[in-house]
Amino acid sequence: MKPFRCNPEKNDALKDARGLSFESVVVAVESGGLLDIVNHPNQAKYPKQRVLVVAIENYAYLVPFVDEEDHYFLKTVIPSRKATRDHLHKGESDVNT
């Protein structure tokens, strides 16, 4: 697998805003937390991006990235209730329905 890279300023902003860093994403991926890789839902605006779906502490995060020639460039980290439901809580009944 290619190495991961990111913008250090964006990494600091993520730590401050979400308490999560790109380093924690990489550790999760390397320890088996990669749940899926999907195309970015807005291919018209982000044609070269794909999205990692990564489990971190029993919650799914979406991590848009660009597949460069010699590395993967991580763009941001987005917590996702839908991805958590779809990838981590399959088959569990929803108490609200």
Task: Specify the residue positions occupied by each region the protein language model found.
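Ribonuclease/tRNase effector modules and their secretory precursors
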Residues: 1-97
